[in-house]
């Protein structure tokens, strides 16, 4: 059982998945900080400039709704949505680039395979050249055998 588990863990796809999860987590943290540190303040600034409010809290106050003491923070949802979209888009670009490189490698392998002729190909070519140099002999049919004339 331990041997099977070791083979399972050492399989390339499991290791790739583990690396992807770790990198994805780290990347999500970076994107979250970019959204919270840059994009959200820019959106707040746009709200302040367009609405004429004195602070971002006043301008974004409409993004937090209170209904009977329950607070709905629409700004957090928008921030999470922006984070998700940026993360998904960057991961899409990474996967697209990886697939392109993978396909390029397959094309190069296919080109290499086509270039190398086999010994059977050489023998066929020799046979065809010899057949082209000597004219075919006439054959005459006698009872059950062919004889050359």
From Swiss-Prot:
The record lists the membrane-crossing segments as 8-28, 74-94
Q: What is the organism of origin for this protein?
A: Enterococcus faecalis (strain ATCC 700802 / V583)
Name the SUPFAM superfamilies on file.
Gated mechanosensitive channel
Organism domain of life: Bacteria
- Entry GO MF terms: mechanosensitive monoatomic ion channel activity
**Protein family membership:** Belongs to the MscL family.
Q: Where in the cell is it found?
A: Cell membrane
The name this protein carries in UniProt is Large-conductance mechanosensitive channel
InterPro entries of this UniProt entry?
MS_channel, MSC/AndL, MscL_channel
Function summary: Channel that opens in response to stretch forces in the membrane lipid bilayer. May participate in the regulation of osmotic pressure changes within the cell.
What NCBIfam families does the entry give? mscL
Kindly list the GO CC terms recorded for this protein: plasma membrane
Query: Where does it primarily localize?
Result: membrane
- Cite the Gene3D superfamilies for this sequence: Large-conductance mechanosensitive channel, MscL, domain 1 (1.10.1200.120)
Q: How does the UniProt record describe the way this protein sits in the membrane? A: Multi-pass membrane protein
For this UniProt record, the keywords arranged alphabetically read as follows: Cell membrane, Ion channel, Ion transport, Membrane, Transmembrane, Transmembrane helix, Transport
The record's subunit annotation is: Homopentamer.
Q: Which PANTHER family does this one have?
A: LARGE-CONDUCTANCE MECHANOSENSITIVE CHANNEL, MECHANOSENSITIVE CHANNEL MSCL
């Amino acid at each position: 059982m331990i041997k099977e588990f070791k083979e399972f863990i050492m399989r390339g796809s499991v290791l790739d998945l583990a690396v992807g999860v770790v990198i994805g987590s780290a990347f999500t943290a970076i994107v979250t900080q970019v959204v919270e540190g840059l994009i959200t303040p820019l959106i707040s600034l746009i709200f302040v400039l367009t609405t004429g409010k004195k602070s971002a809290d006043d301008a974004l106050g409409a993004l937090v709704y209170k209904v009977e003491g329950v607070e709905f923070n629409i700004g957090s949802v928008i921030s999470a949505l922006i984070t998700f979209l940026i993360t998904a888009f960057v991961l899409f670009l990474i996967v697209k680039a990886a697939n392109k490189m993978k396909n390029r490698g397959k094309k190069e392998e296919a080109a290499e395979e086509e270039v190398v002729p086999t010994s059977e190909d050489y023998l066929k070519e020799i046979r065809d050249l010899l057949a082209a140099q000597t004219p075919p002999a006439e054959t005459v049919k006698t009872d059950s055998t062919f004889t050359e004339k």
